[in-house]
């Protein structure tokens, strides 16, 4: 795990509230016990039609080349649901170094910190200003 000093990056906006860990990384992909390889299945059910990698869903932010970066900006209550550490692994393995939101589920926030992913909490007002950019 490397220390984060400064991140120079564009942000990727995910304007969905109450994103739970099963949406971040679906349970059917949790067979591995090492943290490598989970990024390809990040938001899998939102990214692909019929679970087919050759058929990306139009309009989903991770499928849009205009939105690339190492900072994920998510709506409030990000990482709710179960306590799976795999959610932080998948976000990190995809290439995100930080997640910005107005509220994180406590277990997700701790898992992120313990695994080198930086959760940044901002006010809801500030978060909405980011989304408007």
Predicted features by range, described:
Residues 10-12, 22, 69-72, 97-99, ...:
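Structural motif
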Residues 95-108:
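A short glycine-rich beta-strand->turn/loop micro-motif centered on a GG-aromatic cluster
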Residues 105-121:
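Active-site-proximal loop->helix
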Residues 1-37:
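N-terminal, positively charged, Ser/Thr/Ala/Gly-biased leader segments
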Residues 65-96:
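Glycine/serine-rich anion-binding loops at beta->alpha junctions
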Residues 116-133:
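Acidic, glycine-rich flexible loop/linker segments
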Residues 40-70, 74:
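Active-site-flanking structural segment that lines cofactor/substrate pockets
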